[in-house]
Swiss-Prot record:
Keyword Membrane belongs to the record: no
Protein name, as recorded: Holliday junction branch migration complex subunit RuvB
Subcellular location: Cytoplasm
Function text: The RuvA-RuvB-RuvC complex processes Holliday junction (HJ) DNA during genetic recombination and DNA repair, while the RuvA-RuvB complex plays an important role in the rescue of blocked DNA replication forks via replication fork reversal (RFR). RuvA specifically binds to HJ cruciform DNA, conferring on it an open structure. The RuvB hexamer acts as an ATP-dependent pump, pulling dsDNA into and through the RuvAB complex. RuvB forms 2 homohexamers on either side of HJ DNA bound by 1 or 2 RuvA tetramers; 4 subunits per hexamer contact DNA at a time.
GO function terms (MF aspect): ATP binding; ATP hydrolysis activity; four-way junction DNA binding; four-way junction helicase activity
Region (Disordered): 1-20
Length: 343
């Protein structure tokens, strides 16, 4: 879907965006904005591991895309003063690929595996003893001459990241000593992130301009930084050269991001739900066909934020509009029909 690829408020990274993000990532936990419960716990775990001169336990970071899982993995390595090796689940095709990564780690190093839920079963089998016993069990040769070889590994920390924790197998999930869910950010936290990013990028921005971008960023720092870069373009070419609330509002409306943080895809879904199905309930497949999108696109991309904002209900009979749905679309919600009594 071409529209999906260019969606301004998707939490997934765009082509080349990770390189732009690198300069904006904080290095230390104290610089990381938001995720206060996770930061508090990690501070304890990191200090305890350093006091014992041990590698910190394996960590699973899970949550929607764009919330800072990769950044957190880098911070963990930086705080521990160790090296970081990064890869992703789909890249590790064979057990040998994983073995090569593990045998090249130094004591205490962090191995970061993004999209860890996409590891193949064969690779997972190799990972189990590596995580638990810090050993590799490899088969050398084939047929009758094949033999098992155990290779000792340095104590390392595996940091896995996933947007779908439910797709992890139980044996893999159970081997993580620290499970951490990353939550969506509050607008004031995103305002701090936008202000910090603007300072690094040399952008002149007012407090209300930063908040205007923050409150439309769907609780996601990656989206906030992306919108900041695009609003900067409007300020540079069609504005006064700095970002205030008025310019941010005009630029974001031009980018089809409304004052609720909804874009064209969100509007299409809500419009179909209200106009074609009278607010629902309607089955997911029927709704997907009505807006020309795949079922998975609605479930994974469009729905989560609408549900978070109370603009969509999942019911046993299908998707249903809420009072907030009508308000967001500038409609008046119908009054609930009251059933009469028999008496």
């Amino acid at each position: 879907m071409e529209e999906m690829a260019s969606r301004m408020i998707s939490g997934d990274p765009e082509l080349g965006e990770p390189f732009q993000e690198n300069g904006l990532r904080p290095k230390y936990l104290k610089e990381f904005v938001g995720q206060k419960p996770l930061k508090a716990n990690l501070t304890v775990f990191l200090h305890a591991a350093k006091q014992r001169a041990e590698a910190i336990d394996h960590i699973l970071l899970h949550g929607p895309p764009g919330l800072g899982k990769t950044t957190m993995a880098q911070i963990i390595a930086w705080e521990m003063g160790v090296g970081l090796r990064s890869t992703s689940g789909p890249v590790i095709d064979k057990a040998g690929d994983l073995a090569a990564l593990l045998t090249n780690l130094n004591p205490g190093d962090v191995l970061f595996v993004d999209e860890i839920h996409r590891l193949s079963p064969a690779v997972e089998e190799i990972l189990y003893p590596a995580m638990e016993d810090f050993q590799l069990d490899l088969m050398i040769g084939e047929g009758p001459s094949a033999r098992s070889v155990k290779i000792d590994l340095p104590r390392f920390t595996l940091v896995g990241a996933t947007t779908r924790a439910g797709m992890l197998t139980s044996p893999l999930r159970d081997r993580f000593g620290i499970l951490a869910r990353m939550q969506f950010y509050e607008p004031d936290e995103l305002q701090q992130i936008v202000t910090r990013s603007a300072s690094i990028m040399g952008i002149d921005i007012s407090a209300d301009g930063a908040f205007e971008i923050a409150r439309r960023s769907r609780g996601t720092p990656r989206i906030a930084n992306r919108l900041l870069r695009r609003v900067r373009d409007f300020a540079q070419v069609a504005g006064p050269g700095y970002i205030d609330k008025d310019l941010a509002d005009r630029a974001l409306l031009a980018l089809e991001v409304d004052r609720n943080g909804l874009d064209n895809m969100d509007h299409r879904l809500l419009k179909a739900l209200l106009d074609k199905f009278a607010g629902g309930p309607v089955g997911l497949d029927t709704l997907a066909a009505a807006i020309g999108e795949e079922r998975s696109t609605i479930e994974d991309v469009i729905e989560p934020y609408l549900i978070l904002q109370g603009m969509l209900d999942r019911t046993p009979r299908g998707r249903k509009a809420t009072h907030a749905s009508y308000t967001a679309m500038g409609r008046t919600a119908p009054r609930p029909v009251q059933q009469g009594t028999l008496l």
